Amino acid sequence: MRRTKAEAEQTRNDILKAALILFDEQGYAQTTLSTIARKAKVTRGAIYWHFENKEEILAALAQAQFTELNSQINAAIAAPDTWQNLADNFIAYFRGLLKNPDRLRFCCIFNQHGRIPALEKLYRDYTALWQAQSREAVQRGKENGELHRDADPEYLYFYLMMIFTGLVELCLDQPDAPHLAQYCERVIRDTIALMQTL
């Protein structure tokens, strides 16, 4: 019997969900397509219908996690008050991170990029994208008066990523810590305010 588009999409989502759990619980290298198929309750053939290999599954997971964030960053850059919008988007991201187990799982996996070759390329690609977005945001901030005209885009990117990475680590290590969401918001707003003085 021919499957509907909705059924095919559900199968794809089931595969991604199973892979996300297994990559987190037993590691990317230790996870096979067979174990993903068993976890998702599908055949290996169903996996190959949607994905050629584990690398494609990993890339699809990254796309699912970062597409919305990247779209929001691009919208913030285009807005008149670029850096205020970026602060709002980063705060929303961390609120979602603390409330969404799947997002937390993926961040745990993504943070292993130094030990997983397939992740290393993804990490480099997304880092290059975020660095380009940061440069554009700095340029916009200079043009609209939010940042100093002589602000160094490379330093501001480094500074922002240092804060962002630290907050992600705290969310992964202590997701249930009291006041974490509130403190994340405060740190982000203070960071953006400080960057506007640099």
Where do the language-model regions lie?
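Short hydrophobic/aromatic patch on the recognition helix
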Residues: 41-51
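Short alpha-helical scaffolding segments that buttress acidic/His motifs in well-ordered protein cores
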Residues: 90-93, 107-110, 160, 164, ...
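Alpha-helical DNA-contacting segments of helix-turn-helix folds
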Residues: 58-65
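Short coil/turn segments at alpha/beta junctions that flank glycine-rich nucleotide-binding fingerprints
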Residues: 25-29, 100, 144
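Amphipathic alpha-helical packing segments from all-alpha helical-bundle domains
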Residues: 67-70, 74, 99, 117-144, ...
